[in-house]
UniProtKB/Swiss-Prot annotation:
Residues 583-600 have a biased composition (Basic and acidic residues). This is Chaperone protein DnaK. The gene is dnaK. The keyword Endoplasmic reticulum does not apply. Pfam families: HSP70. Keywords: ATP-binding, Chaperone, Nucleotide-binding, Phosphoprotein, Stress response.
Length: 600
């Protein structure tokens, strides 16, 4: 019986790679064309499906050739081809099936399991879509792991004894991620993540395309944008030029028979210098600098604390990228690993760990944004802070806001703002059947659980009745890295204003709760206390109500402190009377009052 092999797959926006563990070492598998990377392109022609290199060649001529489908994963968008609409996961499944097929030929037997990588900022919907794509392709997805984490895993395989902090700079074809990880004793823990979901090597290609269009218009009196085939050829040549300029100072662009001009066929010959290319793409380089700084800040470390800087993605071969990284971090990036293959290698290593082929390696990912629920007054109460290591389960006890409340609504929010309305609403559900009781008495346990694939489950349980409701968060709308970074930035910019709003709401809730409890206590036990003390307490309660109407938070806080002191005296007096009384219920009443005051 053949030993279990779990494929490690980098399902990329531009290219995909598959690797396995062989003799406890990762091996990247070549596709039928002898290449170690496969274009993530699917084409349909005459009811035939074509994947990979052959499909990429049809991008020029076939309108039903589909590229960059990864950008649509987790959305409800579809692509039209072969006289039908395809969901993004269906197209991704065809790429995965192709990788699976040629991997099986190399291995010599069927393979049914895989570890697939995704960008660090893929949300629940995108991760679920990736798992579904694997399922459609006939693969059981054992684990979804973040691409930068996989890269660090590949790099750290032979260095598990040394403690180190690593920054992973991942510039792919369509996405950009920065992660800071800590490696220690075989454990890989993500300290922070940042990035830009709308930045990648394609943007550098597009700058060259724009330059070519302008030059061809000026020198050849021909507009390539007017000819679809000509424009597609420009895009292909732009990618080649970018690659060439990573190794040489000048690259020649040769495009014979690009189109027909006034005087016959147009044969383009142009030269692009690296210095000129770097000047026209300097703004793109700058866009990758801020996420580096943000990732370090989130990890609470300085650049000088980094032991290694890893490069992931073919675009990191550009000298300007490496120079910027070295200048920003004052450290040369490590170029010892193949940036195109390292993510798949890391996925294969994780597969090897799951299959028992590799031991002493533990992978820990994090959640990119804070998760919590909306509580009284519209406050966003966090349960799992951002950058918490996953898998994780956290619980907290909440209660009712009204007397005899038999149902509560659990609103799940994601984000860094202190008010629920300023964050992203992920889902909402009701817990019914709560036993009627005074406000604050029922115990409702809210639990958040994030599994190894980053999928979130939220439950609410009435501790007394045992009634429970659970939802799994599966957003149909994606949250891009750009949106996440914007949310974090907005939280930082509004931190002071949000804190004031939160303080006002919490003070109001605190005051209303205390008034409610004390008025009830005075009604129930007023005969047990001194009339003067009771009169003073009632006067302070009225002053508190007046301040609530005037919305004066600072004065309200001072009055709260005073009334809480009076309430404490009230509780002590009641307790003393209960101790001297022969009636046990009186003692029970005093304890209840004391507990209510402490609760607020």
């Amino acid at each position: 019986m053949a030993k279990e092999i779990i494929l490690g797959i980098d399902l990329g926006t531009t290219n995909s790679v598959v690797a396995i563990i062989e003799n406890q070492k990762p091996v990247v598998l070549e596709n039928p064309n002898g290449k170690r990377t496969t274009p993530s392109v699917v084409a349909f022609k005459n009811n035939e499906e074509i994947v990979g290199d052959a499909a990429k060649r049809q991008l020029e001529t076939n309108p039903e050739a589909i590229a960059s489908i990864k950008r649509l994963m987790g959305t409800d968008k579809t692509v039209r081809a072969n006289e039908r609409d395809y969901k993004p996961e269906e197209i991704s499944a065809k790429i995965l099936a192709y990788l699976k097929e040629y991997a099986e030929k190399k291995i010599g037997h069927k393979v049914t399991k895989a570890v697939i990588t995704v960008p660090a900022y893929f949300d629940n919907a995108q991760r679920e879509a990736t798992k579904n794509a694997g399922k459609i392709a006939g693969l059981q997805v054992e684990r979804i792991i973040n691409e930068p984490t996989a890269a660090a895993l590949a790099f750290g395989l032979d260095k598990t004894e040394k403690e180190m902090k690593v920054l992973v700079y991942d510039l792919g074809g369509g996405t950009f991620d920065v992660s800071v990880l800590e490696l220690s004793g075989g454990t890989f823990e993500v300290l922070s993540t940042s990035g830009d979901n709308h930045l990648g090597g394609d943007d550098w290609d597009n700058e060259i395309v724009n330059w070519l269009v302008k030059k061809i218009k000026e020198e050849y009196d021909f507009d390539p944008k007017s000819d679809k085939m000509a424009l597609t050829r420009l895009k292909e040549e732009a990618e080649k030029t970018k690659i060439n300029l990573s190794n040489q100072s000048v690259s020649t662009v040769s495009l014979p028979f690009l189109g027909m001009g006034k005087n016959g066929p147009i044969n383009v010959e142009l030269e692009l210098k690296r210095s000129e290319f770097e000047k026209m793409t300097a703004h793109l380089i700058d866009r990758t600098r801020k996420p580096i700084v943000d990732a370090l800040k989130q990890a609470k470390i300085e650049a000088s604390d980094l032991d290694e800087v890893l490069l992931v993605g073919g675009s990191t071969r550009m000298p300007a990228v490496q120079s910027m990284i070295e200048h920003t971090l004052n450290k040369k990036p490590n170029r010892s690993i193949n940036p195109d293959e390292v993510v798949a290698i890391g996925a294969a290593i994780q597969g090897g760990v799951l299959a028992g082929e590799i031991s002493d390696v533990l992978l820990l990912d994090v959640t990119p944004l804070t998760l919590g629920i909306e509580t009284l007054g519209g406050i966003a109460t966090p349960l799992i802070p951002r950058n918490t290591t996953i898998p994780v389960t956290k619980s907290q006890i909440f209660s009712t806001a009204e007397d005899n409340q038999t149902e509560v609504t659990i609103s799940v929010v994601q984000g860094e703002r202190q008010l629920a309305a300023d964050n992203k609403m992920l889902g909402r559900f009701n817990l019914s059947g709560i036993e009627a009781a005074p406000r604050g008495l029922p115990q409702i346990e809210v639990s958040f659980s994030i599994d190894v694939n980053g999928i979130t489950t939220v439950s609410a349980k009435d501790k007394k009745t045992g009634k429970e409701q659970t939802i799994t968060i599966k957003n149909t709308s994606t949250l891009s890295e750009e949106e996440i970074n914007k949310m974090i930035q907005e939280a930082e910019e509004n931190r002071e204003a949000d804190a004031l709003k939160k303080d006002k709401i919490e003070t109001t809730v605190r005051a209303e709760g205390l008034i409610n409890q004390l008025e009830k206590s005075i009604t129930d036990q007023g005969e047990k206390i001194d009339p003067k003390q009771k009169e003073l307490l009632e006067k302070q309660i009225q002053e508190l109500k007046d301040l609530l109407k005037e919305e004066k938070t600072d004065e309200l806080k001072l009055k709260l402190d005073q009334i809480e002191a009076a309430a404490q005296s009230f509780a002590q007096a009641t307790a003393q009377q209960a101790n001297t009384s022969e009636s046990d219920p009186k003692a029970d009443d005093s304890n209840t009052i004391d507990a209510e005051i402490k609760q607020d």
